[in-house]
């Protein structure tokens, strides 16, 4: 297997990352386990998930699969999409990020997530609120690194600028 450094973090990840979007929906638990095991046998140590994948089922299945080998793996998850019926269970507000992270940690059966992504840019929440919340969670050790998924380049640049200005995790 080929491993690469993940940016300037110093951690090494397999060149391929296994996405788990199909876990719990298109792929039942047995099919998900077969895919996961094939990846592990091939040396893959990098697994991507999100709270909204199969409305949490993907995280639950992945959490069961990583038991016993968690420390060897790089696990990602994401926050933003609607979970349940609560009107505030979506977006990048402090309330939703914290609630979503706690639920993801429980489903993944882990005390931390290696990379926690904002799944989308949230135009309704102040970027300062979002980034301060993520910085707090990095400080608490619940997430190791933060990331952005499905952001335009200008949105990433703006987030990096705000994080740098406040000396927050970026």
Residue map of PLM features:
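N-terminal binding-site loop/beta-alpha segment at the start of enzyme catalytic domains
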Residues: 1-74
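N-terminal small/glycine-rich loop or linker at the start of catalytic domains
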Residues: 7-23, 76-89, 112-117
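Ser/Thr-centric signal marking residues that sit
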Residues: 9, 45, 49, 77, ...
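A cross-domain feature marking catalytic cores of carbohydrate-active enzymes
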Residues: 20, 49-51, 77-79, 120, ...
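Glycine/proline-rich, positively charged
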Residues: 27, 37, 41, 84-170
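A generic structural signal for secondary-structure junctions
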Residues: 66-67, 80, 161-164
């Amino acid at each position: 297997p080929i491993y690469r450094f993940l940016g300037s973090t110093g951690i090494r990840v397999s060149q391929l990352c296994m996405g788990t979007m199909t876990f719990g929906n298109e792929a039942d638990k047995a099919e998900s386990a077969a895919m996961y095991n094939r990846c592990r046998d091939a040396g893959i140590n990098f697994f991507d998930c999100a709270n909204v994948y199969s409305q949490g089922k993907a995280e639950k299945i992945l959490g069961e699969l990583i038991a016993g080998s968690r420390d060897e793996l790089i696990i990602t998850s994401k926050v933003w999409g609607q979970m349940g019926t609560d009107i505030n269970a979506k977006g990048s507000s402090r309330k939703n990020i914290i609630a979503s992270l706690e639920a993801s940690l429980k489903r993944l059966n882990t005390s931390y997530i290696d990379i926690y992504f904002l799944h989308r840019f949230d135009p309704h929440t102040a970027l300062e609120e979002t980034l301060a919340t993520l910085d707090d969670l990095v400080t608490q050790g619940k997430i190791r690194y933060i990331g952005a998924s499905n952001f335009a380049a200008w949105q990433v640049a703006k987030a990096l600028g705000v994080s740098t200005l406040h000396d927050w995790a970026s």
